[in-house]
């Protein structure tokens, strides 16, 4: 097969996400304790309740996780007694604190060598439901585009997100491959859009979904060899 475009998931594909989110949440909490003491110790359950109310009022934020988080912070701050202007300012500042901390992550060591090798032969893109920014991580030069669910309000596994990626990558589904860790969002989503899908499975989990991925890898450094075999028709 001829491959022109390779798209990548980000979270839990190019780095381990859970530790950095836990750390970012802790950093946010500490900042709020210092700069918004009225809110500082609010229970997490209270924030989740606000989140549900925000989504009921603004369902279009479902896939815009940055805007949603900022709205939750704003409403929590208002309810804690800050006036509208203060709540707006503190929400902006606290969200930026979270976003900065969210990018203090450790990219898997094989990521950059693999991207460098692939970028010499293929167009590379990002398709993510998260709010990580490859520009903040020094990875932007490898990618022709980075498509986030927030950009168009549609999230994986919706095929429309992958169709948008094909347009931006100037490719057709039969010449594109997607790599990701999530059986539904990444594998099923890509396959439903007509792409081949490679399951990134570093921990050797058992595949349990009905339709198997087109291939499985434990490390991203397996990608160049796998794609070369596909190109040869092996």
Predicted features and spans:
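N-terminal helical cap/lid subdomain that shapes the substrate entry/recognition surface
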Residues: 2-109
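Asp-based, Mg2+/Mn2+-dependent phosphohydrolase catalytic module
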Residues: 1-6, 18, 85-87, 112-234
